[in-house]
């Protein structure tokens, strides 16, 4: 009963990605059964045409606070949220809504021509609108998760780093926050809300566990703990072989495991 998601910066952000243009990644996402992703600031590195016509074709991106610049209308190619119907072992299913959010710093962290025609609005306001439209109140979903490319840090008193996003844990109806962007390993609770971030470059997997109980046809979902699992460590010969095979296609030298 696992839902796998990403918090963005999928196709760019490293030297290797600049050479490959992210070509190896669609297959990886399919094998991992990644359901969706937030949009990271690096998603815009190669401009909107690449994001819309290439990256967004093989990955379901969501972002509630990326809108048209002229009138702040929704973008045709981008959904603010996505629902996953997750089957339960004992029968039935729960409906989980993921609301995407992107750091507003993207406006100053990428070239202006790469984000022409779009705007990044306040993430708290955007998330509140999605939840208030009836995701929970109208019984459309059983659970709401914010999937955000907005940094968090355990050393920050508020955990969430960006000033315009600090109130996200206080939005009524939100059950969890999955974050990225600051490259830190985070597992915390703010306002009794779990917040997790799994480091950078696939070094960790973030895992949030929830218990689902059914009573009179309604589901009660309770957070029962999480973990940040380190997956980068001692070399794995099978994985190293696959990586080297892929890198050989682009003229890279053999990967050495330290």
Locate each region found by the language model.
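Hard-cation-handling environments
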Residues: 219, 230-258
């Amino acid at each position: 009963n696992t839902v796998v998601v990403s918090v963005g910066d999928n196709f760019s952000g490293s030297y290797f990605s600049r050479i490959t243009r992210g070509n190896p990644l669609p297959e990886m996402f399919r094998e991992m059964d990644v359901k969706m992703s937030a949009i990271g600031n690096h998603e815009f590195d190669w401009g909107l045409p690449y994001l819309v016509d290439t990256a967004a074709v093989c990955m379901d991106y969501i972002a509630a606070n990326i809108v048209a610049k002229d009138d702040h209308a929704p973008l045709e190619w981008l959904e603010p949220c996505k629902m996953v119907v997750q089957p339960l072992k004992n029968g039935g299913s729960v409906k989980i809504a993921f609301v995407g959010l992107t750091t507003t710093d993207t406006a100053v962290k990428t070239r202006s021509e790469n984000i022409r025609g779009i705007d990044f609005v306040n993430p708290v306001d955007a998330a509140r609108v999605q939840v208030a439209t009836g995701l929970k109140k109208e019984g459309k979903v059983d659970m709401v998760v914010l999937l955000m490319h907005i940094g968090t840090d355990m050393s920050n008193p508020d955990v969430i780093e960006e000033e315009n996003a600090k109130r996200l844990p206080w939005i009524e109806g939100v059950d969890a926050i999955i974050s990225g962007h600051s490259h830190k390993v985070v597992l915390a609770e703010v306002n009794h809300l779990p917040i997790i971030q799994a480091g950078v470059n696939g070094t960790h997997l973030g895992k949030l566990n929830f218990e689902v109980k059914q009573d009179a046809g309604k589901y009660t979902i309770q957070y029962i703990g999480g973990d940040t699992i380190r997956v980068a460590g001692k070399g794995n010969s099978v994985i190293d072989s696959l990586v080297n095979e892929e890198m050989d296609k682009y003229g890279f030298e053999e990967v050495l495991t330290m």
